[in-house]
């Protein structure tokens, strides 16, 4: 028999259970670990905040230094380049350009930015621009600044020039809103009907006399062979003075239509009328006043209701209640509508002709020469075609256009537009041609 001692363990080892005296030690260790973690988190957060604060302080330090340098350069520039300017005005310009610089919307080139601001201020005074707030003035300056760069970077080798004008503070969106799409007429005059109009004109001695001047010739052997090439109605008194529709009313449709009727009476009746565009803006319900319209509906209005004189319904550029003159009215007898090459070979021969062109933001800055720049994709501006010519140095042919943007735009209010002889030609100028007609000589 084997005797087993009862103090020897049998089977698996026994699990050691912590005594009550070891629990406080573990709790203390956990607290120490937590405190260390909190301390590390605090130190890390403090470090990040300190680094961020240092970065912010550094940014503002250098920004402040940059603004200070900008101001110093501006003061130096204005004192050396504008010595005759009133000191208080010089200080005002410096303060304003520094304030604009602080917005971050202009460059650090104090000299050029200051020059632009001074030119902008002269522009504001010249065109009587009004700004309701500093923010609005800044926004207009930034737009002016953009057009300023376009003008200054325009290549002198181009056959046309650009310059700042009353449109220079209009954004592209604002300018586009003034010139909505012009829909071409849906029906056109038959060539047989147009031939009747042409034969009537041949019976008018006033017309024949002015046609010779427009063509630059002393004798016309065969009237049927006369075309619009080298014909310029502006050589005669058949073109009424340039007018200005303003920079806040899209009324080119009314101005071009009135211009054509004024020319018609000068050319066939030898009467110098000044007629009312404002009546068309107010009363032609087929159009939208200052929001755009169609020359064809304007001429239809004059045909059916007549139009008042400018002195009785003067132009304001604001849509007002329709109150035309009751007594004094000028009428037309009919309307001719042609397209394509018939516009130059037939329409223009009868009289200055209403056409549509697709203008762009560049054309608004045109100041002279033969415009060969980009055109828009759709007709959006109605003008009066008064002639066709050629530059004898380059051989480039061009259209002569009477615009409604005032005498201080383009070539005393006129535009020479490149003639390409391709399709509907430059800017779609041959898409349609409208002529008012008088039957009686």
UniProtKB/Swiss-Prot annotation:
InterPro entries attached to this UniProt entry: Papain-like_cys_pep_sf, Pept_asp_AS, Pept_his_AS, Peptidase_C1A, Peptidase_C1A_C, Peptidase_C1A_papain-like, Prot_inhib_I29
Coiled-coil segments on the chain, per record: none
Active-site feature positions: 252, 381, 403
Any GO MF annotation of the entry: cysteine-type peptidase activity
UniProt cross-references to SMART domains, sorted A to Z: Inhibitor_I29 (SM00848), Pept_C1 (SM00645)
Disulfide bonds: 249-290
Glycosylation sites: 270, 345
Assigned EC number: 3.4.22.-
GO biological process: proteolysis
Pfam families: Inhibitor_I29, Peptidase_C1
Keywords: Disulfide bond, Glycoprotein, Hydrolase, Protease, Signal, Thiol protease, Zymogen
Family the entry assigns: Belongs to the peptidase C1 family.
Name of this protein: Cysteine proteinase
Origin organism lineage: Eukaryota, Sar, Alveolata, Apicomplexa, Aconoidasida
């Amino acid at each position: 028999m084997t005797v087993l001692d009862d103090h020897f363990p049998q089977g698996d080892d026994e699990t050691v259970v912590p005594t009550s005296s070891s629990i406080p030690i573990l709790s203390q260790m956990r607290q120490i670990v937590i405190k260390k973690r909190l301390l590390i988190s605090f130190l890390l957060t403090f470090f990040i905040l300190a680094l961020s604060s240092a970065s912010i302080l550094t940014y503002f330090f250098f920004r402040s230094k940059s603004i200070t340098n900008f101001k110093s350069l501006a003061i130096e520039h204005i004192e050396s380049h504008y010595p005759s300017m009133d000191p208080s005005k010089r200080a005002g310009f410096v303060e304003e350009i520094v304030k604009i610089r602080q917005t971050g919307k202009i460059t650090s080139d104090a000299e050029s930015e200051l020059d632009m601001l001074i030119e902008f201020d002269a522009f504001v005074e010249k065109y009587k621009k009004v700004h309701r707030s500093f923010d609005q003035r800044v926004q207009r300056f930034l737009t002016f600044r953009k057009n300023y760069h376009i003008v200054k970077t325009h290549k002198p080798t181009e056959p046309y020039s650009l310059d700042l004008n009353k449109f220079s503070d209009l954004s592209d969106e604002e300018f586009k809103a003034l010139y909505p799409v012009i829909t071409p007429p849906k029906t056109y005059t038959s060539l047989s009907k147009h031939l009747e109009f042409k034969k009537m004109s041949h019976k008018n001695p006033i017309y024949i006399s002015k046609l010779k001047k427009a063509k630059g010739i002393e004798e016309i052997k065969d009237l049927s062979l006369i075309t619009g090439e080298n014909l310029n109605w502006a050589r005669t008194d058949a073109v009424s003075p340039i007018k200005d529709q303003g920079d806040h009313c899209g009324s080119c449709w009314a101005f071009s239509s009135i211009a054509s009727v004024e020319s018609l009476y000068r050319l066939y009746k030898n009467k110098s009328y000044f007629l009312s565009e404002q009546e068309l803006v107010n009363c032609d319900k087929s159009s939208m006043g200052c929001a755009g319209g169609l020359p064809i509906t304007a001429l239809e209005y004059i045909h059916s209701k007549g139009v008042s004189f400018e002195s009785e319904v003067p132009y304001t550029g604001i849509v007002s209640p329709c109150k035309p003159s009751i007594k004094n009215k000028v009428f037309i007898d009919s309307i001719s509508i042609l397209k394509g090459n018939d516009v130059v070979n037939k329409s223009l021969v009868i009289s200055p002709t209403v056409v549509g062109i697709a203008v762009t933001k560049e054309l608004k800055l045109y100041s002279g020469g033969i415009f060969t720049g980009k055109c828009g994709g759709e007709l959006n501006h109605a003008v009066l075609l008064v002639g066709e010519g050629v530059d004898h140095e380059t051989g480039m042919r061009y259209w002569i256009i009477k615009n409604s943007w005032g005498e201080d735009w383009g070539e005393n209010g006129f535009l020479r537009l490149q003639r390409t002889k391709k399709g509907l030609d430059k800017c779609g100028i041959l898409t349609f041609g409208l002529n008012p007609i008088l039957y009686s000589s």
